[in-house]
Amino acid sequence: DGPLIIFVHGWPELAISWRHQLPCFGSLGFRVIAPDLRGYGGSTVYDRHEDYALENVVADMIGLLEALGANKAIWVGHDWGSPVVWSIASHHPDRCHGVANLCVPYYTLDRGLDACVGLINRDIYPKDEYPLGQWEYQGFYEENFAAAIAPFDANPFNAIKALFRGGDPASKGKPSRTAYVRRDGGWFRGAAEPPDVPRDDKVISEIDLFAYADALSRNGFFGPSSFYMNHETNATYADRAVNSGVLEIPVLFIAAEYDFTCECIDSRLTEPMREHCTDLTSKVVQSGHWMAQEKPAEVNAALAQWLATSLPDVWPK
């Protein structure tokens, strides 16, 4: 019965992505919930790209909130879960005590791919070589969706091992591997299926690996990857945000120092967020993209400190 925190996962994850956060904040007295988003795990799989537009996913989350008998929640997102949470905050601020997001800053992917392109670090991604910068892979989804998802569907087990890797400081200042997807004609240098690489036990256990792979084998990658197919629709939806998109609720953003796709340290990617949040707290965790799983103690500490200082009235009594 404590204050409600809803954790929203990203691509290609599940509710178990928050397995290190749920017991932590539950033990502090919060009521903690982590759903599988539409297309994932035990949730409904829809068969049209447009079914995965942010407006529809936000409606799911508001429906979940109401089904839980709550008027407001603290919302926490990661990866595609971040645009979902940002959209809840910008369209339904009355449903938010506050919001926290990992890796993907506000006023970027929640407003479509074009909102990100103008913020690319062209020192790393010259425009003539990487027109979409680190977001080249998203352009490939739009141009050849079937080819984009084929290797993942061919071997979800290997896909999870290849994707869920810890941060690599040596890659700083170099193009992200996502920048080569369009040039290579697909993920994994255009291979028919992902390489068989060792599991990175700093990020996922063997049990986690099988849970992810089993769910993605059942449902396939059509639904999860359809999140990349609604940029124009999402931009139109974002234009209808209340208060001109300015967030006046408490906001926490946690950047991953070694996430070189959502690169927030040496780029302009966070500038629009800073201009559109009146109560923003920013933190940096030394991790790769999967920070809630790679560095759970640091993520939990950042979340707990923000909750205690920015939302003291919501802290469990």
Model-derived segments and their meaning:
Residues 4, 40-72, 76, 80-280:
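Flexible "cap/lid" subdomain of the alpha/beta-hydrolase fold that forms the substrate-access gate
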Residues 11, 15-18, 80, 86, ...:
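Signature tryptophan residues that serve as conserved aromatic anchors
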Residues 1-45, 78:
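Conserved HGGG/HGGXW glycine-rich cap/lid loop of the alpha/beta-hydrolase fold
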Residues 34, 255, 284:
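Conserved residues in the N-terminal Rossmann fold of short-chain dehydrogenase/reductase
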Residues 10, 53, 79, 294-295:
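Active-site helix-initiating loop/hinge in glycosyltransferases
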Residues 277-317:
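Catalytic active-site module of serine/aspartate enzymes centered on a nucleophile-bearing elbow/loop
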